[in-house]
Amino acid sequence: MKKIKLEKPTSGSQLVLQTLKELGVEIIFGYPGGAMLPLYDAIHNFEGIQHILARHEQGATHEAEGYAKSSGKVGVVVVTSGPGATNAVTGIADAYLDSVPLLVFTGQVGPLSIGKDAFQEADTVGITAPITKYNYQIRETADIPRIVTEAYYLARTGRPGPVEIDLPKDVSTLEVTEINDPSLNLPHYHESEKATDEQLQELLTELSVSKKPVIIAGGGINYSGSVDIFRAFVEKYQIPVVSTLLGLGTLPISHELQLGMAGMHGSYAANMALVEADYIINLGSRFDDRVVSNPAKVAKNAVVAHIDIDAAELGKIVKTDIPILSDLKAALSRLLQLNKVRTDFNDWIKTVTKNKEKAPFTYEPQNHDIRPQETIKLIGEYTQGDAIIVTDVGQHQMWVAQYYPYKNARQLITSGGMGTMGFGIPAAIGAKLAQPNKNVIVFVGDGGFQMTNQELALLNGYGIAIKVVLINNHSLGMVRQWQESFYEERRSQSVFDVEPNFQLLAEAYGIKHVKLDNPKTLADDLKIITEDEPMLIEVLISKSEHVLPMIPAGLHSDEMIGLHFTDENEEVDNA
């Protein structure tokens, strides 16, 4: 391998930072420890990269996720060996399922101690292998620039994902006078494939004979930077669209062809479109079970086309008639260039529009309890649907998906595939650092809040003005809902008998606390959401709230419960 001489002796830790800076990294999220002391010593006087000191390694990884999801850049994490690395595993797994580009540096004991059960040693490479796109253990200091450059490239290209670098302490300490050539040399790695004209023409030909097509808009549209092209394609052919959770914002909720989120807690119009369609075009979605519910019953009478950058996703869940392995942006760009095929979906559009009107998301205002749906709807109005919205996981996540009026790309930052409680607050911190001029609002339940609330310490420490909307029902709401619906109301360990005083907790972190419990003054009280300072807005809601409508596990998209039809003569299941 070609060697490159350095101007002066340089430590492994300095090489890490210099390489990251050359790659354009501006922020690192981390937490120090023994095996990473050499790197943190180098960080002390290093200029050009800001280090954000998390309060827990899980917090650091979620902060990096929020930063990456909001900006499209690679999120960088630095944690120590052993418990530092294992604490980061949840965030790494979350990033893996949601295709988030992360570069995670984990400390490791010295090379001579590896495999000998040394203090704070863990087989981090083995632990993270199933939940990373690739991982490395650096054994030679001169190899640091090459591996860091390669890992960064792998994290952000193809299907994005987390890449882990295990960095033994001795390797980061040693000084070298020359390095291995860091130029990329990955002859067997294909960044992405591009669809052929023949494949795309087949997709369009099927569209020309279709009468009831629908597009599933997935997170891949966001990740590939394809939102504008996607919208142009939808407009050109006038195809109704259903969104996955991670696909919200790819087409504005207000658009006449947007049917809303599909799946377990999706809209009636979206789910019925999947049932009635004769042609399903999946763009950048995994056919996740939370979207299609019962894969065996999906598209029984429909032709399925699926464009995805990952060959493993094509045909994995749902039988696919037109599988297209391709970078989505390239495929959509070419679809717009090809000669337009003749289509007529007017009758179909009338049908899906009627379904939107027939059973919209709705709720009954109450005089004694605040409705969470109304809280979210009002915040949507006050922010004009333009805020960066972050959620934790649970009932509030689904209400926010249903009721916030999304209109922008990368607007919703949430944990999709893994459904990680504790994601919300740190992810919002990362999103605000990526988009400092945006109003960043995080919705969190009282369960998820108590998992990572220590990250609130960063708000005043770094001047991060996020708004935390705590939807407090004194329970693990989604768990309780399932117990009440499917386990004969046995609320086993899902109700909090004792909770902290959230006002005192907010004051301990030096942030404003507002408690809202009066539905009559809610509209005025929530105007505080537009203020530019960190705050905790605690909204008290009833323990009896359920997220509806819902497709019970294993049932089909047309077997929803809890629907409310505008026509009183329609059959309603309020189970």
Swiss-Prot record:
According to the record, cofactor stoichiometry and binding are noted as: Binds 1 Mg(2+) ion per subunit. Binds 1 thiamine pyrophosphate per subunit.
Instruction: Show the PROSITE patterns listed in the entry.
Output: TPP_ENZYMES
Co-factor(s): Mg(2+); thiamine diphosphate
Q: Which CDD domains match?
A: TPP_AHAS, TPP_PYR_POX_like
User: Remarks, anything else?
Assistant: Contains 1 molecule of FAD per monomer. The role of this cofactor is not clear considering that the reaction does not involve redox chemistry.
Family classification: Belongs to the TPP enzyme family.
What's the protein called, per UniProt? Answer: Acetolactate synthase large subunit
Q: Can you name the source organism?
A: Lactococcus lactis subsp. lactis (strain IL1403)
Lineage per the UniProt record? Bacteria, Bacillati, Bacillota, Bacilli, Lactobacillales
